[in-house]
Amino acid sequence: MLILVSPAKTLDFEQPPLTQVYSQPDFLYHSQELIQVCRQLAPSDIATLMKVSDKIAGLNAARFEGWQPQFTLENAKQAIFAFRGDVYTGFDADTLSSQELERAQSQLRILSGLYGLLRPLDLILPYRLEMGTALNNARGKNLYDFWGDILTLAVNKTLTEQGDRIVVNLASNEYFKAIKVRQLDGQLITPVFKDYKNGQYKVISFFAKRARGMMARYIIKQQINSIDELIKFDAAGYYYSEEHSTQSEPTFLREAQ
């Protein structure tokens, strides 16, 4: 079972990592090509392209300029400890055991605009380059064109190695669009999380993001390897609703908080 998640805008490079174990990203050659494109952008270009403030644009211009592909624990950090958004709050990597981190290294992949596809312990430098960015490059008009089939082929390779060929998509639509579903060599499961509000069950972004992280954690900690086990997920008051589900979109409901 392979889990796909999105990265986070919020980063933490201040706290030291909880393990000295690390790996290197698989697609640094491609990342370098993107960095060269980004270095041609003035801070004002970055502000417009990424729809960010001048301050954040200046910070990212400096990050692009200082980026270099020799990653060590002195200048970089493992992705799973560097990302600090709602998904990662739900996943709570800081409290996983070394064995569970090892399992996550095998089963969890983080889609990234700059790095393509990251394992949890892959080292990264701080960056901001969202997958939906319309960055013109030698391969096309955006990052979906840039990554092309690369990420889908990488996912298929991992599915072959794992054997069960189940992909659990816990990523946002923006990031999952980088995967070519028709080329996926496995069964795609996209869990949906809905909270009760104003008389109906609906997807509430903040809660759904955190629930995605909690489900990823559940899969790792409980060593889930089947859909029958997956739908037993019940963290934080969520429960599986067969009535609201389809075969590819198991839906989990939660009453008003």
From Swiss-Prot:
Highest classification ranks of the organism: Bacteria, Pseudomonadati, Pseudomonadota, Gammaproteobacteria, Alteromonadales
Similarity remark: Belongs to the UPF0246 family.
GO BP field: response to hydroperoxide
InterPro entries according to UniProt: YaaA
Signal peptide: none
GO-annotated cellular components: cytosol
Domain of life: Bacteria
Naturally occurring in which organism (per UniProt): Shewanella sp. (strain W3-18-1)
Name of this protein: UPF0246 protein Sputw3181_3112
HAMAP family: UPF0246
